[in-house]
Swiss-Prot record:
Protein name per its UniProtKB record: TnpB-like protein ORF457
Protein's organism: Acidianus two-tailed virus (ATV)
Alphabetized GO MF terms: DNA binding
UniProt keyword annotation of DNA-binding present: yes
Keyword Ligase: no
Alphabetical list of InterPro entries matching this protein: Cas12f1-like_TNB, RNA-guided_DNA_endo/Transpos, Transposase
Entry's family note: In the N-terminal section; belongs to the transposase 2 family.
Superkingdom per UniProt: Viruses
Disulfide bonds: none
Keywords: DNA recombination, DNA-binding, Transposition
Length: 457
């Protein structure tokens, strides 16, 4: 059935978003979503594998074609005919992709809608601090090899997840594909994306759900029967507040309004980051040499190795961040915290330094992990711009001098741990409160299999 219009539909998982609470103070309340994504690995047989490749390539081709025409319209006319291009490419691809062509076009619609929203924010001077450039939607292809990425997009009502038999049923393509993995979330399913991971030579299904939702006026037939029907698992035990300063050597410095001070050391994150970037640099150098001498097959293989190392680094960092977030939020829950003021270190990533200091990705992912875990415990989270929070004394509002050992010296005659000063300033900026008596820090090291206390600190 053809679409009635080029409408903008939203079936994807949404990360927490920030809306101004006190705009002039740089404090933004995080808005939670009830959307989560189950990710499982598919185990297609030989016939299914070949069919998936054809369909995924066709799906990506549709995305790129409509995106190319819309980009040309934008660059030449300054506007985009969403409805006209939607109808044109739906008619072109509906025979092979069926109604799933709508899902591909809707995904591109959403990308353009997001782009125009950011353009408007930029014109109004309200662009989020971590966004420096606004560009039209890009293509579904690898930047270096220029090959299309394999991604099959399926409309939310054109597939079924058989949780009992571990099978993913694609109605329009007559396929029942076995899968392995945990279906953590229970709820109404959204738009499915099946993605081929070239670095692992494996297919993964990304199944978004509205957690706990089974009805929208009437009971939906399209429900993923996962383990959890609710995101929130507990309520706050008290009304205390906490502030979090994110950093490099100390990943998180946390101050609670009762004077509790928590420190999470970043030894493992830096080890992983620099180890993998060294290996990646070696592979990049070798890839450049093979390209220069015309060894194209070897060059492509080295590009795959480079991507594999990047993805492995990201997986390891995400695992560390989730371990930290889980331990931190559980600790704050036991301490009776109900509100968190989370520093947004946009100023750090703008300063010159090594890649670890200037890379925005780790900070955004760490913030995301903390916010998602806080949602499970019913805590409110506000993001606070960290601008100048480490340069001024939290107690006297005067500029401090920082020595190499991580201590700031106030002209008024006292010293503070720089990460403590940052956390105190975040709390002060957010609610106008300064914790006068801070307890001895509880220090932890974040590892891949646990978060362990550091004795004697």
């Amino acid at each position: 059935m053809p679409p009635s219009s080029g409408q903008l539909l939203g079936d994807e998982e949404r990360e927490p978003t920030s809306t101004p609470a006190i705009p002039e103070e740089g404090v933004y309340k995080v808005k939670y979503s009830n959307r989560r994504t189950n990710i499982v690995r598919l185990l297609p047989n030989g016939f299914q594998e070949r069919k998936l490749r054809r369909l995924a390539d066709l799906s990506a081709k549709l995305f790129n074609e409509v995106n190319y025409e819309r980009r040309q319209q934008f660059f030449h006319e300054g506007k985009v005919d969403i409805k006209g291009t939607y109808k044109k490419y739906y008619e072109k691809y509906k025979e092979k992709l069926r109604t799933n062509a709508q899902a591909v076009l809707n995904k591109n619609n959403e990308a353009w809608s997001s782009f125009f929203s950011l353009l408007n924010l930029k014109k109004e001077g309200k662009l989020p601090q971590h966004i420096k450039h606004v560009s039209p939607p890009g293509y579904c292809k690898d930047r270096k090899t220029k090959k299309r990425k394999l991604i099959l997009i399926v409309r939310q009502d054109r597939y079924k997840v058989d949780a009992e038999n571990n099978k993913l049923i694609l109605k329009d393509f007559n396929m029942e594909i076995e899968f392995v993995g945990r279906l953590r979330w229970y709820g109404k399913q959204g738009r499915l994306e099946i993605i081929f991971d070239e670095t692992r030579n494996a297919w993964y299904a990304h199944i978004p759900v509205e957690v706990g939702v089974e009805e929208t006026g009437k009971k939906s037939k399209h429900v993923v029967k996962g383990e959890r029907k609710s995101i929130q698992i507990a309520k706050p035990k008290g009304n205390k507040v906490a502030s979090i300063d994110l950093g490099i050597n100390v990943i998180a410095s946390v101050v609670v309004s009762d004077g509790t001070w928590l420190l999470y050391k970043g030894i493992r994150t830096k080890e992983d980051y620099f180890y993998f970037h060294k290996r990646i640099a070696e592979v990049q150098s070798l890839a450049d040499r093979t390209r220069n001498i015309g060894e194209y097959e070897a060059y492509l293989e080295l590009l795959r190795e480079e991507r594999r190392l990047f993805k492995k680094l990201k997986r390891r960092l995400l695992h560390l961040y989730r371990n930290l977030a889980s331990h931190l939020i559980k600790t704050l829950h036991e301490l009776g915290v109900s509100t968190i003021y989370l520093g947004n270190p946009f100023n750090i990533v703008q300063e010159k330094g090594d890649n670890f200091m200037t890379d925005k990705w780790p900070y955004r992912k760490l913030m995301h992990a903390i916010e998602l875990k806080a949602q499970e415990y019913g805590m409110k989270v506000y993001e606070v711009d960290e601008y100048n929070t480490t340069k001024y004394c939290a107690y006297h509002d005067v500029k401090v001098k920082r020595n190499p050992r991580g201590v700031v010296i106030c002209p008024k005659g006292h010293k503070l741990h720089s990460d403590l000063n940052g956390a105190l300033n975040i709390l002060k900026k957010a609610v106008g409160v300064v914790v006068n008596e801070v307890k001895k820090p509880l220090s932890f090291i974040v590892d891949h299999n646990r978060v362990a206390p550091i004795k004697g600190v």
